[in-house]
């Protein structure tokens, strides 16, 4: 009993966590790319430890796709590519990756990081519902632009294009990932022809404040009108945050599971009205012509 108590002291828990971090770093050395990163930014710090930003979610996404028996081929499009984290990851599974990033600082790093793979093409433009010049507001403490947003009232000059007008690819489009800080609906309105012809999976981030009080979400409603009738979302117990209402013991049990490596990631496929109104690392929209292929994991 005494020995068991010693093993559960804070110092031993810290050692177990340190071993997990070292194991991840060794895996990164053996498999993950040597990214050029922007120091002290959230995405960069995660890449240093995990090898990729959102590595667990991306790995699980590929596992889920394979579980469906879906072939990873054709073109993946990365809209809001930032420094290239998702682009480089997708390049290892798809025949071609097209990366779009309007922020000139992020694009500088994207251009270098994309050279790590031979099948990535990069474009220093943003995707919108019209072809025009605009501005990008970049926070002073976030030069990489994770919190940047498009503005009509000054900022860094950028070019916006409609994907329908810009795109030329010899491969079928299998996946479109969109992460552009609340500008997703504008981007989708400029790619109706692409979505109608290719019917790709659409992977997009959603913030809690993008859900209305009645649970409705403008992006999800728009995609539903285009024939996207099923949506998959991730439940990652490793990133669950407990409020005070959930109690002391819930937090302790969650902490113990994390230390023992027992936390799980799950993927749920549901209707548009059943998606929890909270922050989502990504939601996957599935076209009705492909629905029969997908299931929970």
Can you name each region flagged by the protein language model?
Residues 1-113, 117-119, 152-156, 166-171, ...:
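S-adenosyl-L-methionine
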Residues 49-77, 133-135, 142-198, 210-215:
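Short internal loop-to-helix segment that lines adenine-nucleotide cofactor pockets
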Residues 89, 93, 187-194, 218-222:
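A short acidic, amphipathic alpha-helical/loop segment
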Residues 94, 227-228:
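Short, well-ordered alpha-helix to beta-strand connector turns
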Residues 104-142:
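Core alpha/beta nucleotide-donor-binding catalytic domains of modification enzymes
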Residues 199-206:
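Conserved beta-strand signature within the Rossmann-like core of class I S-adenosyl-L-methionine
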Residues 207-209, 236:
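Active-site beta-loop-alpha junctions enriched in small/polar residues
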């Amino acid at each position: 009993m005494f020995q068991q108590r010693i093993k559960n002291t804070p110092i031993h828990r810290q050692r177990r966590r340190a071993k997990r971090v070292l194991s991840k770093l060794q895996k990164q050395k053996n498999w993950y790319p040597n990214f050029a990163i922007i120091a002290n930014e959230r995405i960069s710090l995660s890449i240093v430890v995990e090898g990729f930003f959102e590595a667990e979610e991306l790995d699980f996404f590929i596992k889920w796709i394979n579980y469906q028996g879906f072939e990873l081929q054709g073109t993946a499009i990365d809209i809001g590519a930032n420094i290239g984290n998702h682009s480089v990851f997708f390049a290892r599974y798809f025949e071609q990756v097209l990366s779009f990033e309007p922020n000139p600082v992020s694009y500088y790093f994207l251009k270098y990081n994309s050279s790590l793979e031979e099948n990535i093409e990069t474009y220093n433009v943003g995707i919108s519902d019209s072809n025009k010049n605009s501005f990008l507001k970049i926070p002073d403490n976030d030069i990489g632009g994770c919190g940047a947003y498009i503005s009509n009232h000054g900022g860094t000059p950028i070019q916006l294009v409609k994907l329908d007008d810009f795109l030329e690819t010899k491969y079928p489009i299998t996946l479109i990932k969109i992460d552009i800080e609340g500008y997703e609906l504008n981007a989708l309105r400029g790619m109706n022809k692409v979505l109608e012809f290719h019917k790709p999976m659409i992977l997009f981030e959603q913030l809690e404040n993008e859900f209305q009080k009645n649970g409705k979400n403008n992006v999800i409603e728009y995609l539903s009108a285009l024939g996207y009738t099923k949506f998959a979302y991730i439940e990652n117990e490793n990133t669950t945050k407990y409020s005070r209402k959930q109690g002391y013991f819930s937090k302790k049990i969650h902490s113990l599971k994390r230390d023992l490596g027992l936390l799980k990631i799950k993927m749920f496929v549901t209707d548009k009205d059943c998606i929890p109104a909270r922050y989502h690392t990504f939601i996957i929209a599935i076209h009705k012509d492909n629905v029969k292929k997908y299931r929970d994991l």
